[in-house]
Amino acid sequence: MLDLHQVIVSIIIGVIEGITEFLPISSTGHMIIASHWLKIDNENTKILEIFIEFGSALSILYFFHKKILRILKFNINVKKTNTKNLHILLAILPTIFFGLLFYKKIKLLFNTYNVMYALILGGIFLLISEIFKPKKYKTCSINDISLLQSAIIGFFQIFCLYPGFSRSGATIGTAILLGIKRSVAIEFSFIISIPLIMGASFYDFINNMHNFKILDLPIFFIGFMISFIVSILCIKKLLKIINRTSLIFFGIYRFIISGLIYFIN
């Protein structure tokens, strides 16, 4: 029989992930905070979070699947090939490399205090991105993103390895500073998030298999489905919110949350 408390916790964490994944406020940071305040910060929770993050990644894949198929479609004429695979590789390889290299050390940062500092740093970065962005966009289509822009975005995406900084905040903020149109920056950010989130979820699961219990699978599945469904229901609306809202607003929100963490803890 399912434990009602575990079911409720799974639903809460799933909803949090489903909403925060698409905003530059750090979904991982919010899950860490929620786990701490719900007093469920244990090994079993880590497995639950892996399933939940995988659910949101699948929702992104579903939402952008037509765009992704066009990107990956082989074209004999290289000159006419849209956003090539190399652009995506350049944007994700730095995070993969440093994520694998410092995996154990990064996991030691998963606590509320480090999230608090990362929320502040990420908030400052969002403010800088919005204040110092070019007056005119240089890149107005995802197909026009250059290899150099992809590489720079990939470099700054490394900061997302610090829990609470926000992967989307790092990539969208960097892209906007590079003169990429906001809607294009958002689209590119979430397309490159798919292999990273799925890869990270798989690698985390492999490293935490010793904590996996088959009896807990229904709880994990509930979290997975809640995250997937909430993400599917919210993604279109939330992407519109990011596109129409100044990054300064999200920066201020991050400062408020970090302040709450400081005073409550």
UniProtKB/Swiss-Prot annotation:
One of its GO terms (biological process) is cell wall organization. Its EC number is 3.6.1.27. Pfam families: BacA. Signal peptide: none annotated. Keywords: Antibiotic resistance, Cell membrane, Cell shape, Cell wall biogenesis/degradation, Hydrolase, Membrane, Peptidoglycan synthesis, Transmembrane, Transmembrane helix. InterPro entries: UppP. It comes from the Bacteria. The keyword Repressor does not apply. Disulfide bonds: none annotated. The chain crosses the membrane at residues 7-27, 45-65, 86-106, 108-128, 145-165, 186-206, 214-234, 245-265. GO terms for cellular component: plasma membrane. GO terms for molecular function: undecaprenyl-diphosphatase activity. It is found in: Cell membrane. It catalyses: di-trans,octa-cis-undecaprenyl diphosphate + H2O = di-trans,octa-cis-undecaprenyl phosphate + phosphate + H(+). It is a multi-pass membrane protein. Belongs to the UppP family. Catalyzes the dephosphorylation of undecaprenyl diphosphate (UPP). Confers resistance to bacitracin. Bacitracin is thought to be involved in the inhibition of peptidoglycan synthesis by sequestering undecaprenyl diphosphate, thereby reducing the pool of lipid carrier available. This is Undecaprenyl-diphosphatase. The gene is uppP.
